[in-house]
């Protein structure tokens, strides 16, 4: 079975991954069929670059993405776009829905970032209050 998975590269403590199509029996960093993109988890924010047409091809011929790769592909909107095409929508409808999806996804990311900043500020305030008392 062909799997779409991550192949580790980079140096020690600085991982960088290639997204590859590989035989499921091959080792993680072993033989692969095709490079489909890359993922850099150490960048802030992390970066994902995929070749959408090739990933779509491999998914259509039955390749199974691993859980991590599935979430990375889902984050790019490719799975949503493939689902819209499968439902038989016109190109203009797909483009409109994808634009709405991108806006909603940007709002979600901004909301998560704001929540993270609020938690960080609350923690700093609590530490400052604790050090002022003690």
From Swiss-Prot:
Gene Ontology cellular component annotations, sorted alphabetically: cytoplasm; small ribosomal subunit
Annotated Gene3D superfamilies: 3.30.1320.10
Protein's UniProt keywords contain Transport: no
Keywords: Ribonucleoprotein, Ribosomal protein
Keyword Ribonucleoprotein: yes
PANTHER family to which the protein is assigned, alphabetical: 30S RIBOSOMAL PROTEIN S16, SMALL RIBOSOMAL SUBUNIT PROTEIN BS16M
Protein's name according to its UniProt entry: Small ribosomal subunit protein bS16
Native source species: Chlorobaculum tepidum (strain ATCC 49652 / DSM 12025 / NBRC 103806 / TLS)
């Amino acid at each position: 079975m062909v799997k779409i998975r991550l192949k580790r590269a980079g140096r020690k403590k600085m991982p960088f991954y290639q997204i590859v199509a590989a035989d499921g029996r091959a080792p993680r960093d072993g033989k692969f069929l095709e490079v489909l993109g890359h993922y850099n988890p150490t960048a802030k924010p992390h970066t994902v670059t995929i070749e959408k047409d090739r990933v779509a091809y491999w998914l259509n011929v039955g390749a199974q993405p691993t859980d991590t790769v599935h979430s990375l592909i889902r984050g790019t909107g490719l799975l949503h776009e493939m689902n819209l095409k499968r439902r038989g929508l016109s190109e203009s409808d797909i483009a409109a829905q994808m634009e709405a999806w991108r806006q909603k996804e940007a709002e979600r990311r901004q909301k998560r970032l704001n929540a993270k900043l609020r938690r960080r500020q609350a923690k700093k305030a609590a530490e400052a209050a604790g050090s002022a008392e003690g």
